[in-house]
């Protein structure tokens, strides 16, 4: 489907950031708040329409990247959300709280390492308690490892 604005076709190749991204080094897990330019996760652009009113979601990896975009979209669509993130990413989670304060949805922040089974159990338990149940799981948490050639990706 073409990118339309006022029923006029707009070539999408000119719509987004095109400059070379400067090399940036951070120790994992890294913070989105330290990236330049900042990734567009919908902070300014996404407008909700109430499509998820009354829903309750747990979003893993919701402090940055795609997970942050999902958290913003779900909250602006009316869902109450619980966001899991690594404790080292607290600054990104705090900025998400600041962004979504006053938007009308409940936001529960749940730090924890998903590689630990007990942490997983606690996160789910705390999300269910905080939101009075769950309707949706967005299992987005992951790590990024840059490789120069796709053949080296596993």
Residue ranges and their predicted role:
Residues 60, 111-112, 134-142:
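Rossmann-fold scaffold of SDR-type NAD(P)-dependent oxidoreductases
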């Amino acid at each position: 489907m073409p990118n339309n604005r006022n029923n006029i076709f707009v070539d999408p190749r000119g719509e987004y950031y095109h400059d070379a991204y400067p090399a940036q080094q951070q120790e994992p897990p890294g913070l989105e708040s330290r990236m330049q330019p900042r990734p567009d996760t919908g902070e300014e652009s996404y407008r909700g329409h109430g499509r998820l009113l009354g829903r309750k979601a747990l979003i893993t990896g919701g402090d940055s990247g795609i997970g942050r975009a999902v958290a913003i979209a779900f909250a602006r669509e009316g869902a109450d959300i619980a966001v899991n993130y690594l404790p080292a990413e607290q600054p990104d989670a705090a900025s998400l709280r600041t962004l979504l304060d006053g938007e009308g949805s409940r936001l529960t922040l749940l730090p924890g390492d998903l590689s630990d089974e007990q942490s997983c159990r606690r996160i789910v338990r705390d999300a269910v308690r905080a939101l009075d149940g769950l309707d949706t799981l967005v299992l987005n948490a992951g790590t990024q490892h840059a490789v120069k050639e796709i053949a080296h990706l596993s």
